[in-house]
Regions:
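N-terminal-proximal low-complexity accessory segments that begin disordered
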Residues: 1-74, 79-82
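Beta-strand-rich solenoidal segments
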Residues: 2-21, 69-152
Length: 152
């Protein structure tokens, strides 16, 4: 992942539950980023503990596959959890038209085929999404967003 970060300070084995700011001290990105990582670690671990390695809500579970008469595969809308991390698909989408398309073509022909949901995080910069640039400050990029990508 790319970004201009001071340092990575999050270590799960320290068992910190938060980072507290002190008055009159310098505010640095490492403290903020560690708090974000602590919260994410707790959220993902809690979800994995309660849901299991993967799963979805009873109503609204996403990523179900349907095949039409012509053999076209559609990935269903909804939410699913992969290793405790939330993955969302806002609308039904053709297998071949996913936001992060697969490198190869889907299998063709009759028979059994294996499908699985793969998810990952990636940084999104102002180059990727100009709306995250801070125009009120003259246009610098003040942050990097983290996007959860997926592919079936």
């Amino acid at each position: 992942m790319n970004g201009d970060f001071t340092r990575e300070t999050f270590r799960p084995q320290r068992h910190y539950w938060g980072v507290l700011r002190q008055q009159g001290r310098v505010n640095i990105d490492a403290d903020w980023n560690e708090q974000v990582r602590i919260a994410r670690h707790h959220d993902v671990a809690r979800t994995a503990d309660l849901v299991g390695p993967s799963g979805g809500p009873i109503a609204g579970a996403g990523f179900g596959l349907t095949v039409d008469a012509a053999g076209a595969v559609t990935v269903g809308a909804g939410r699913y959890y992969v290793a405790g991390a939330l993955v969302e698909n806002e609308s039904d989408v053709a297998l071949t038209a996913q936001p992060d398309p697969p490198a190869g073509l889907p299998p063709t022909g009759a028979g059994l085929h294996l499908a699985y949901l793969d998810a990952w995080d990636r940084h999104v910069t102002a180059i990727d999404d100009p709306t995250i640039r801070e125009f009120a400050l003259g246009g610098p990029d003040t942050r990097v967003a983290v996007l959860r990508g997926f592919i079936v």
